[in-house]
Design a protein with these regions (language model features):
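Loop-rich non-cytosolic ectodomains and luminal regions
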Residues: 1-179
Length: 179
């Protein structure tokens, strides 16, 4: 599959299909908006062998943006879109109809990598923010669950503090694997 993209801004301005460029980042501007979009096409990504389209928006106009995906060949469309991880965009950037069951990305989505899910050990509940499988290729992931909510660990100056998230879960997983 080879895909290309276009956009519709909250104000209704449309950027038609942006042709695939193998060598350079494409800078897209709007007539009526201050938003600038950068599009990078990577036809064969080195880690997956699949196409990657990286989209970066500067000063996006608030509202609903539409991403239009075009395919080059007449076959069923099979693509996935992910938002940046927490902290790389504002919390009000969301998909209107997200799929919560294909959230893992590289490297956790690759077969030889062990991918833990994060859970709260005190009540055995999974973290809603934890990545979930299947992968985009249908592999079953995560491989197991590891504590990652309110995990006590070393802090500054010999103190201890609680941490939560995938990093805490990964630290416990790494320690267990080292044993």
């Amino acid at each position: 599959q080879l895909f290309s993209v276009g956009f519709r801004s909250p104000g209704g301005e449309t950027i038609p299909r942006i042709p695939v460029s193998l060598t350079q980042e494409q800078r897209i501007t709007f007539v009526l908006e201050r938003t600038v979009i950068y599009v990078n096409y990577e036809v064969v990504q080195t880690t997956t062998g699949s196409q990657l389209i990286l989209i970066r928006m500067l000063d996006p106009t608030p509202g609903i943006w539409t991403l239009q995906v075009y395919r080059a060949f007449p076959s069923p469309p099979d693509f996935h879109v992910w938002l940046p991880i927490t902290g790389f965009s504002t919390s009000d950037v969301i998909f209107l109809e997200p799929d919560p069951y294909t959230t893992l990305t590289t490297p956790s989505a690759t077969v030889p990598v062990l991918s833990p899910s994060t859970y709260q050990a005190s009540n055995n509940s999974f973290s809603p923010e934890s990545g979930r499988g299947f992968t985009r290729l249908g592999e079953i992931k995560p491989d197991f669950a590891s504590p990652g909510i309110s995990v006590t660990g070393p802090g500054p100056a010999g103190s201890y503090e609680n941490r939560s998230g995938a990093s805490a879960s990964a630290a416990i997983t790494s320690g267990a694997a080292a044993l």
